[in-house]
Amino acid sequence: MSESPYTSGTTHFGFRDVAAKDKQKLVGEVFTSVARNYDLMNDLMSLGVHRAWKRYFVTTAQVKPGDRVLDLAGGTGDIAVLLKERVGNEGAVVLGDINAGMLSVGRDRLTNRGLVSGFDYVQCNAEALPFPDQSFDLVTISFGLRNVTDKDAALREMYRVLKVGGQARVLEFSEVTAEWFKPIYDFHSFKILPKLGKLFARDADSYQYLAESIRKHPPQESLKGMMGEAGFARCHFKNLTGGIVAIHSGYKI
């Protein structure tokens, strides 16, 4: 049996080629660095629009009161809070993240807001989830898939833990569709964003990586195809704000 390209060889870390086995550690260092300023990072990367994107992502999800939901790369918990509003008191949200620092920030933030009941926190790798088959009615990942080394494995795991009839949703920075806007977006990403990261978070390198990681992420049609290969049916995507981000959806049938 041939060895997986993600257990040997190289992969990308931003625009750099690195040993595949090292990417998880390098990404972990980035998010440990930005954990306390994560919402600021998203504000800088999206000019504040990420809050509207996230709310739309959750309000259009297939979820109902009483459902059990998994939010991967759950970060500081903003998606988890919105999901909990949808599933209500009888439902549950599991916030999963591979990075202990991000998970700690999310737990502290929700606890400080008095949001305790119905939330669970699990440090986990999206490529090998510690949950039984068919555990969740909805699985989401927001602004996290591009940082995963083996995206195909993560999509297969999302499919595995999803109940039959359930939906998986991916919210991610994607490929801008308007040609006239691409140079403006590139200028903001590569010239402005690292400077803002240095100014506000004292960390230009992490913000440079985050901008580069967007350009290395599969474009919309490619990711749709990857979801189909992972087993999902009725896969589709919707561009938001001219393709700066896209929402991908698929179902387990």
From Swiss-Prot:
Domain of life per record: Bacteria
Principal EC category: transferase
InterPro entries, per the entry: SAM-dependent_MTases_sf (IPR029063), UbiE/COQ5_MeTrFase (IPR004033), UbiE/COQ5_MeTrFase_CS (IPR023576)
Binding positions (S-adenosyl-L-methionine): T76, D97, N125, A126, S142
Family, similarity comment: Belongs to the class I-like SAM-binding methyltransferase superfamily. MenG/UbiE family.
Role of this protein: Methyltransferase required for the conversion of demethylmenaquinol (DMKH2) to menaquinol (MKH2) and the conversion of 2-polyprenyl-6-methoxy-1,4-benzoquinol (DDMQH2) to 2-polyprenyl-3-methyl-6-methoxy-1,4-benzoquinol (DMQH2).
Protein name: Ubiquinone/menaquinone biosynthesis C-methyltransferase UbiE
The species this protein was found in: Xanthomonas oryzae pv. oryzae (strain MAFF 311018)
